[in-house]
Each structure stands twice: as C-alpha cells, then as structure tokens.
Amino acid sequence: KTILTAALLCAFLGTQAQEYYEKHVAFPAGATTEQKIDMASRLVPTPQQLAWQQMEFTCFLHFGINTFTGREWGDGKEDPAIFNPTELDCEQWVRALKEGGFKMAIITAKHHDGFCLWPTRTTKHSVTSSPWKNGKGDVVQELRKACDKYGLKFGVYLSPWDRNAECYGQGEAYNKFFIEQLTELLTNYGEVHEVWFDGANGEGPNGKKQEYDWDAILKTIRRLQPKAVTAIMGDDVRWVGNEGGLGRTTEWSATALMPN
C-alpha cells in the first residue's frame, strides 16, 4: 500500500510538472488561439521573479556626474573634477527609503556618460579621478553598506551605452570592456538582487553604435549572481512600456518569446 501510494504521488507530481511552464512558454507551430491561452494560463514565475513581485516597492536612485551638470544625459566629456559630493550620506538615503516602505535600492553605477561611481579598473572617467575623498571614494560601496545596515536589498544599473569609452562601437572590444565593468560590480559588493539594463544604443565618441553581446552579458550575471533578477534587457523583469511613472491599469507580467 505504501509503495502504491508513493507511486501514485510520483505520477501525480510528474503530471503536475508537465502542466506548468516556468518563466517561458513556446507555442508549438499550428497552435490554436485557445491552446495558446491555455498554455499561457499555466505559465508560472521563477522563485526570483516571484520574490521580486512580492517586494512591490523599489527605489531607483539616479545619482552621478549629471547631478553636478544639471543634465539628464551626459555626453561623456565631463571633467571628473566637478564630482565632489562632500555631503553624500547614503545612510540618510536608505534610512528614508526604509521609513517609506521601500524594499530595494538600485543605483546608477554608470549612466550614458560613462562616469563610474566605483573605482573601476576599466576607465579613468570615474570617482578615482575626482577630488571626492581624494579619489578614494566609492558610492556603490557606501550604498551597499547602507542597504545592509537597514535591511534593504541592493541592485545596480549599468548603462550599455557609453559616450566616453573609446572602444564603444568596436564590437568585441567594447563587449569585453562592458563585461569587465559588470564583473567588478557583481564580485566586489556582496549579493546583488537586481541588475538593470536599458536598451540605449546611441553613438559613442567615435560616432559608431555598438552591437551588445546580450548572451554573454546574461551568462555573466547567471554565473556570478545566480539569484539576481535581470531587468528590462534581461529575461526576468520587462519594461512597463513608458517612463511616465504609471503602468497600465492591468499590467500582465508575461513576456513574448521569439523562438530561434
């Protein structure tokens, strides 16, 4: 009786596993609308996606050299000497977020201007060339420690578009440069819960555009921070569709997948 019960349970679980699709579902050729609706209704999130949805309240902190130029997008020609946030207090930021009910803070570690808020080895267009803390400062580290102190999760935004890097637009050379920056962020700052990329793809200082190696980029994240969700250009969290601050009344989480 015990063996039979166990066998029936295994059979039941096997059936259940076949009925649900995690993260992605690919419709077979010739599937009817009804079949597609049925399959889509059995699409479930990964544990990381579910945990992300349950947080509900994340703060995206836009801070960088543009804070000192008053521009939305920098051109990569900024003098690092203007970056000198002598009164920076990441604990004050995170304490306010905690009191406001936020569950995670994401920092613009590098925006389109290419200026890095951490002491990267990849470029001089960073905090190391600024007067702030005599070039020894690290905004990413200060925010990371503040998040740890107040119990918030931590994420990073890294702009694929770089208007300062000379290798931008040179294919493999820039992809290697970008992945090196990403690797620094994912290995030197403890657990990273979200990695946020947009699809910005303007011209670099050489007038060229870059073809990003998203496959290699996402593999790097999965290898170094397997629990992190990837947002917008990743395959865990998609863009809401506008920058107005509000999504549609009904905003489904399903993402269209184009099979190879």
Regions found by a protein language model. Name each.
Residues 1-19:
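Bacterial Sec-dependent N-terminal signal peptides
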Residues 17-260:
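Mature catalytic domains of secreted/periplasmic carbohydrate-active enzymes
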